[in-house]
């Protein structure tokens, strides 16, 4: 028998305030509410500190509302760790018990489009979407009171300043293959392939400035990070990605990589530190630096594009630029989106009536959704680059809680969980038992269609260039066969290039991708600068030192382009070295002379190399 326990007595007063200073900033037009918690527990059951599911009744705009919350069991991995440093520099790592945490996702009753991301640690703090509008809620700091302030995000006073920007300068329109892909809708086949979740095991590093900003209090920093990741996890559910926090590192005794006003230098230094240090002691897929520094210009974040799983470049940096955790979480979602192959949205990209996550500028309008372009770019990235690290599911923390069939969470003993039989949209799953139907051959994969292997000979990976080979399903597997391509060194593009790992790299295409149309390969004289061995010209790096090119290798160092676009006249244009150093160099495999191609900063013979 289930009894309903009224934990507190409803005392909702429709009090309207005109202005108040809250944790989220200066707020105009807020409402004071007293939420009532209603818990359904089996008779005689001991109430845990933080239940797996809760509901609250409150009034918003004078209308009753029921907020349903469910603990975010995807928030932490079982091997979650926290690291900080003693005043004498000693590394201190702990493995706290995080099963009984207080971070929830939820929805509003009778509002199918509603969402919520809430911390219930000390009252209710977070945001929820009601009838298409974002509301923030936080407890008022009144002694012996359950009073909370509820207010629309639009009523938070905005700073009178220039728009906040992402530091990535590459625009969506410059990528022709992705531009074409964005003109498509998300097909049923793509949806089937995306349906199985990917898993990003995330480490967040809070720099020394964050430690100082939050009163040198480790608990305050942790709480802020947990709130951000809870929202980040909610945002990425729309891309079928689960973000699990596997580690939090706080640089309490000083920064371990260079954190400067230059976002480019900060990102590069952080990536080097991750590769050299963090990866050796903590298994993870992606690391984000959360910093209190105010980067030069309007930049609030930066990341490398399409480098998830890379030891150095699977990183991002995010400025802690707002007292509203939603806005910082959106910025982190944006930068991680770059790691996952997403570019800034162009004019034709849309996510309904909202500003989209991958907009280059952080809008004063709320943004929690990815655009149609982002969906297609993510699909293209997964299918082309197949980043293996995000396929493994993190160790789960919910081993204490018994599985509940129908809650849309895949738990111990379940093969699938698509919700109630009435709401289940996943035909492979028997919603009544949370087991796969007996006739199911596969659940996911490019060669899986309606839970069956696709017919042998069905193309599953189109060739991306004349150097590539199209692959077809075997009829015996859900996976597309290993990507194969024509032999390296084979002439391509009318002898302007040579095949290299399935592509035909030529300098013109690289210049076009970096700078747009009307930009071409520079004259040979520009490449002579690569003999200098400085920021403007070199062939490779050895232990951080820029090595000058030998005369015969000058076209295998820094890339020089001739920019004839309107308003420009730069015959020897180079890509800024502080933005993304591997983009400033001539790509491996590029033709550097007749019968020769570039490799590791040298121009070598095709015949002998292959």
Curated annotation (Swiss-Prot):
Residues 1-19 form the signal peptide. The active site is at 335. Its cofactor is Zn(2+). Binds 1 zinc ion per subunit. Disulfide bonds join 309-389, 349-373, 351-356, 405-434, 416-429, 418-424, 428-451, 442-448, 447-473, 460-480, 467-499, 492-504, 511-561, 526-572, 539-549, 556-598, 592-603. Glycans are attached at residue 217. GO terms for biological process: proteolysis. Keywords: Calcium, Cell adhesion impairing toxin, Disulfide bond, Glycoprotein, Hemostasis impairing toxin, Hydrolase, Metal-binding, Metalloprotease, Protease, Secreted, Signal, Toxin, Zinc, Zymogen. Residues 198-394 form the Peptidase M12B domain. Ca(2+) 1 binds at residues 201, 285, 389, 392. One of its GO terms (cellular component) is plasma membrane. It is found in: Secreted. The disintegrin domain belongs to the long disintegrin subfamily. This is Zinc metalloproteinase-disintegrin-like 3a. It comes from Crotalus adamanteus.
């Amino acid at each position: 028998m289930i009894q309903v326990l009224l934990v507190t007595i409803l005392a909702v007063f429709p009090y309207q305030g005109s202005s108040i200073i809250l944790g989220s900033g200066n707020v105009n037009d807020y409402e004071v509410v007293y939420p009532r918690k209603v818990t359904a527990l089996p008779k005689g059951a001991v109430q845990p500190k933080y239940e797996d599911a809760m509901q609250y009744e409150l009034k918003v705009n004078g209308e009753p509302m029921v907020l349903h919350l469910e603990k975010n069991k995807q928030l932490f991995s079982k091997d979650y760790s926290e690291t900080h440093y003693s005043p004498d520099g000693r590394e201190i790592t702990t493995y706290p018990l995080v099963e009984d945490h207080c971070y929830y996702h939820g929805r509003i009753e009778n509002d199918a489009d509603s969402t919520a991301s809430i911390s219930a640690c000390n009252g209710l703090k977070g945001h929820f979407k009601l009838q298409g509008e974002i509301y923030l809620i936080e407890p008022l700091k009144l002694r012996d009171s359950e009073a909370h302030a509820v207010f629309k995000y639009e009523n938070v006073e905005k700073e009178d300043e220039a728009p906040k920007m992402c530091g990535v300068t590459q625009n969506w329109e410059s990528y022709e293959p992705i531009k074409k892909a964005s003109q498509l809708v998300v097909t049923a086949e793509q949806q089937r392939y995306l349906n199985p979740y990917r898993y990003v095991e995330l480490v967040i590093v809070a720099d020394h400035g964050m430690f100082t900003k939050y009163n040198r209090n480790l608990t305050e920093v942790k709480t802020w990070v947990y709130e951000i990741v809870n929202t980040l996890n909610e945002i990425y559910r729309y891309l079928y990605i689960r973000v699990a926090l596997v580690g939090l590192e706080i640089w309490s005794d000083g920064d371990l990589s260079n954190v400067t006003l230059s976002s480019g230098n900060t990102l590069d230094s952080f990536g080097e530190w991750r590769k050299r240090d963090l990866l050796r002691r903590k298994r993870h897929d992606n690391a984000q630096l959360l910093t209190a520094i105010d980067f030069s210009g309007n930049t609030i974040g930066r990341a490398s594009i399409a480098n998830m799983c890379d030891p150095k470049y699977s990183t991002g940096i995010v400025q802690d630029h707002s007292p509203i955790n939603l806005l910082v979480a959106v910025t982190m979602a944006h930068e991680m989106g770059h790691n996952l192959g997403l570019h800034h949205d162009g004019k034709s990209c849309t996510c309904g009536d909202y500003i989209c996550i991958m907009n280059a500028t952080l809008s004063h309008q709320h943004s929690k959704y990815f655009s149609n372009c982002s969906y297609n770019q993510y699909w293209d990235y997964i299918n082309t680059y197949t980043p293996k690290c995000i396929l493994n599911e993190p160790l789960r923390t919910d081993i204490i809680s018994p599985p509940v069939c129908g809650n849309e969470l895949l738990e111990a003993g379940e093969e699938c969980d698509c919700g109630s039989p009435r709401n289940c949209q996943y035909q492979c799953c028997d919603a009544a038992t949370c087991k796969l139907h007996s006739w199911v051959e596969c659940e996911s994969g490019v060669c899986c269609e309606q839970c069956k292997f696709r017919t042998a000979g069905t193309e599953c990976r189109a060739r991306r260039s004349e150097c590539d080979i199209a692959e077809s399903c075997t009829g015996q597997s859900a996976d597309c066969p290993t990507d194969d391509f024509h032999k390296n060194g084979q002439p391509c593009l009318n002898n302007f290039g040579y095949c290299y790992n399935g592509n035909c790299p030529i300098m013109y295409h690289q210049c076009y991708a970096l700078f747009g149309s009307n930009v071409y390969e520079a004259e040979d004289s520009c490449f002579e600068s690569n003999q200098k061995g400085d920021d403007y010209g070199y062939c490779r790096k050895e232990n951080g030192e820029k090595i000058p090119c030998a005369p015969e290798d000058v076209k295998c160092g820094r890339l020089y382009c001739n920019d004839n676009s309107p308003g420009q006249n730069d015959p020897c244009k180079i890509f800024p070295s502080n933005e993304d150093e591997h983009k400033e160099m001539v790509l491996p495999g590029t033709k550097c002379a007749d019968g020769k191609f570039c490799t590791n900063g040298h121009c070598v013979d095709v015949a002998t190399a292959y």
